Curated annotation (Swiss-Prot):
Residues 407-437 form a coiled coil. The gene is ERDJ3A. Residues 178-201 are annotated as: Disordered. It comes from Oryza sativa subsp. japonica. The keyword Metal-binding does not apply. SUPFAM superfamilies: Chaperone J-domain, Thioredoxin-like. May play a role in protein folding in the endoplasmic reticulum. This is DnaJ protein ERDJ3A.
Amino acid sequence: MGIPVRSLLVASIVLSSIALHVAAAKNLDPYKVLGVDKSASQRDIQKAFHKLSLKYHPDKNKSKGAQEKFAEINNAYDILSDEEKRKNYDLYGDEKGNPGFGGGNFGNREGYTYFTGGGAKTSHFSSGDGWQTMGGQGNTKTFSFSFGGGNPGAGGGNPFNFDFGDVFSNIFSGGSMGGSQHTGSAGKARRGTKSSGHDSSSVNIQEVTMQIFNKETADQGITWLLLFYTPNTKGQFVLESVVEDVARSLDGALRAGKVNCDHEKALCKKAGVSIGKSARLFIYSYTTTEKGSLHEYSGDYDSKSLKTFCQEHLPRFSKRVDINQFSFPSNIIPNLPQVLLLSAKKDTPAMWRAVSGMFRSRLIFYDAEVQDVSHPLLKSLGVKNIPALIGRSVNGEEQLLKDGISVKDLRSGIKELKNLLENFEKKNKKLASNQAKKPAHTDQPKENKIPLLTASNFEEICGEKTSVCILGIFKSSKAKENLEAVLSEISQKTLIRGQNYNSGNAVAYALLDGNKQSAFLSTFDKSAFKSSDKLLLAYKPRRGRYAVYDNEVTMEEAERFVVSVLNGDVQLSAAGRKPVLR
C-alpha cells in the first residue's frame, strides 16, 4: 500500500525542522554558552551552569528567547559535564570548525538516521557526531527529542524534552521512553554522568543515615543543612550545588548532609518530613532552645539567600552585654565557667554564635562591642588588643585567655576559639575537682560570692528564668558585709540551693544598694525600707510577688526565712509593677 503524498510531505517538513534544531544547537560552542575557558574545571563548569540556569529558567525569566537560551545552557552542560563527550567535542566539534558535527561539516558518515520509538509522541535521531560512543555498527551516537508533553508551566510542548519546571532534570531523558536500544543506553550513560560531573574538591555533602543523625546531628550543638530527597524528586542537583556553596562559605559553622527518604524511611518519619515531587531543604539549628529542631527553607535557590537564612539560624546562646555596666554573675550555675568575647562587631560574631552552640551546656557565654581597650576591666586584665577573650573560672578568678585574636577565615576562627575554650574548660574541671577534694576548714573565712545587683545583670540573676531571687538590701558598708557573709553561707547549703538554672528552677542570691536603688524598692513595701539598715527581700519574678524579712538578720533567721519562702509557708504580696534598676 502506497504512502500518501501528503503524509510524506508532512514527514519531510518535520524531519527538516528537527534537523535544523539539531544543527543550530550543535553549532553553538558549549564553552561560550557557559562562559568558561577550555581549561575550566568541573567545578567551574558546574558553577557557571548553576548561575545561568537560574537566570534563564522559564519559570523565572519570561523574556523572549529565555526558553531557547535555557535549552542551550542545558545542552552545553550535558556536553561539558561528561568527560567523554567533552573530549569528543574538543577533538571533532570545536569552535574552529574542525571536521565534525559541531563545525557544521557533516562530511560523509555524518548524516542522520531517523527512527521512531515506541513511546507516544517520541522520535529519535541517530548521528555519528562524536558525542557519545555507544558501540554497535559504525559507532552510531544517539540523542532524543520529544514532541509535546512538556512542562505545563512552560507554555506548551518543548522540542528538547526538558522539564522546564525543574533545571535539575536529566538532559535528553528520552532513553526510557523510546523502544530503541541506542536511546536507552544513552539515557543510562547520561544519568550516570550527573554524579561524575561534580568536582571532587567541592564540599562534601554527607549521606545521613539514622545512625549518623543520632550520633553526629541530634542535639550535638552543631548546625546542619539537611537535604531530604528521593531518587525521583526534582530539584536535588541544583539544591546540592547551592548547599555546597553555602557550606563552603560557612565552613566550620555548619555541616551539610542529605537524606535519601527511600532508604531512610524511619529517619524521615522521625523528622516529620514527607517528600512529594520536589526535594526539601531544612536547617537543623539551636536558635531558641537547648535542643535542636528542623526549620524548612522556602526562599530562592541562590547562595546569597540561603546563606542569610543559615546565618539567622546559627545558635544564640551568647548574651549581648554593655561592657560599661557588665560584671560576671557569681552564682548563676554552680561549677560552670563563664566567657566574654570582646570585639568591634556591632552584632554577635557568627563564629562566636557557632561555638556557643557547641559549648552551650558547658560554658556561659557573653559578648560585647568594644572599640578601644581603655575600659578599666580591660586594663585590669591586661587586654591590649581586640578581639579578646576573657574568662571567669569557677573559683571566681577573672583572667585574659587571649587578646589580639587573628584568624584568616571562619573555619580557622572557630577552631581557634574551640581550642581556647576547651583548654579553659579543662582547667576549670581541675579546679572543681580540687575544690571537692579539699577538706572544709571552719577556722577560715569562706569566700564571698554574692554579686551586686545592677541594671546589666538583673535579667541574668533575677529574670523570669529564676524561680526565687533572694536580695540582701543594705544601706551601709557594715550591713553589706553582714548580708554578704550570711547569704554566701546559705547559698552553699544543698538543702535550699535548688540552683538548676537550665530547668528554670533556680534560687539566686544578690546584694542591692538601698541608697542608690530607691526607685527599685518603691515597687515593694516602702515602710520596711525606710527604717531598716539591712533586710532580706524574696522576689518571685514569674509571679510578680514578694516577701520581706526586716528583723535582725542572723544566720539562723535568714535561713529560716529562705526555707519558708521555698516551701510556700510565707504569704507573698503582689508587686505594684515590674521592678526596674537604674
